[in-house]
Regions:
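Rossmann-like dinucleotide-binding domain for NAD(H)/NADP(H)
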Residues: 89, 94, 218, 227-321
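Rossmann-like adenosine-cofactor binding region
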Residues: 56-62, 175-271
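N-terminal glycine-/charge-rich "phosphate-binding" loop or analogous flexible N-terminal tail
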Residues: 1-47, 307
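Phosphate-binding beta-alpha-beta segment of Rossmann-like dinucleotide-binding domains, i.e.
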Residues: 89, 97-146, 158-161
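Short beta->alpha connector loops at strand-helix junctions that form conserved
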Residues: 32-33, 74-75, 91-102, 174, ...
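Hydrophobic Val/Ile/Leu positions in short beta-strands of Rossmann-like dinucleotide-binding domains
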Residues: 7, 147-149
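Glycine-rich Rossmann-fold phosphate-binding loop(s) that bind the pyrophosphate
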Residues: 152-153
Length: 321
């Protein structure tokens, strides 16, 4: 009997790349559009493997799927999956950590430049028949300013390399990275408070975990410079949005460029949408045609490898082995 791999949910125009990879091991791919635990349990009950985008893969779900061996996640983060429960149940969890490094680092740099130059304000004015650069004052020279990176993994390292071209001095916070690693990139590794106090621009790249949720909050905003720019291309819940709104509204910080929000799509009554010192894009940082194809192929390859008895390249919960 053929193994069954369910795509729990997806927003892509085609799943042909996934199907091609799973065909190689004779697995049947079954696409669904699950939104809840109950949906996944009902629709995917005989799954050998899952490929997941946003559907919740909880302990309850995994315990209800007796044949489940592997869950592959579209993307870098695995916050939709209870990884600890998966490990206890002997289920391998996979991600694709390297498919969009160029795209996300470019988005972070783009938001940084757009916020620094206040392009949204200027563009909006021109669209409303205005023509006055002075509405964006003051803008200070970017060269020589300090960029603070929260996290120093693959993507922020690429951000650091690109930011050097603009003459930025770069510092970073990452409790898992030794100072000598930072020095290889001409980046100084510092404690969180020091980074937030010194940086003119703060770019968030840490993964979302129980420990990092609301990493940026009322207290940490109080450590920042009043003109500080915050960029987030990682995960929305890393920032306390209510605290962010008040910090921006009260001019305790200067600007925010967000590609992610706590609720996605963003709710129409989100107060951040009322501020002109916020730029928000719809979780697009990961996207290019090439990155999308790479993501789809790699997640399916990983699931196929596990189901055919091979070692997966991008195994998240290594303790499961």
């Amino acid at each position: 009997m053929s193994m069954k791999v369910y795509v729990t949910d997806y927003e892509y125009a085609t799943l042909e790349p996934e199907k091609r990879e799973l065909d190689k091991i004779g697995a049947v791919m079954i696409p669904k559009q699950c939104k809840t635990e109950a949906d996944v349990i009902r629709e995917c009950k005989d799954a050998n493997g899952l490929i997941d985008q946003y559907a919740p893969i909880t302990r309850k779900v995994m315990e209800a799927l007796p044949d489940l061996k592997v869950v592959g996640r579209y993307g870098v983060g695995v916050n939709t999956i209870d990884v600890d429960a998966a490990t206890e149940l002997g289920i391998q969890v996979l991600n694709v950590p390297d498919y969009c490094m160029d795209e996300v680092s470019n988005q972070a740099i783009s938001l940084m430049l757009a916020c620094h130059r206040k392009l949204n304000i200027l563009n909006s004015q021109v669209h409303h028949q205005g023509w006055d650069y002075k509405i964006a004052k003051p803008i200070h020279r970017l060269q020589g300013q300090i960029l603070g990176l929260l996290g120093f993994g693959r993507i922020p390292k690429m951000v650091a390399q690109k930011a050097k071209a603009f003459g930025l001095n770069i510092i970073a916070y990452d409790p898992y990275v030794k100072p000598e690693v930072g020095l290889q990139y001409d980046v100084t590794i510092l404690p969180l408070k020091d980074v937030l106090q010194k940086a003119d621009i703060i770019s968030v790249h840490v993964p979302l975990t129980k420990d990092t949720e609301n990493l940026l909050n009322e207290q940490t905003f109080s450590w920042m410079k009043p003109e500080a720019i915050i960029i987030n291309t990682s995960r929305g819940p890393l920032i306390d949005e209510n605290a962010l709104y008040h910090a921006l509204k009260d001019k305790k910080i200067g600007y925010a460029g967000l590609d992610v929000t706590v609720q996605e799509p963003i709710q129409e009554d989100n107060p951040l949408l009322t501020l002109d010192n916020v730029m928000i894009t719809p979780h697009v940082a990961w996207y290019s045609e090439e990155a999308e194809l790479e993501l789809k192929m790699k997640v399916a390859q990983g699931v196929a490898d596990v189901l055919s008895g091979k070692k997966a390249k991008y195994l998240v919960n290594r303790d499961v082995l």
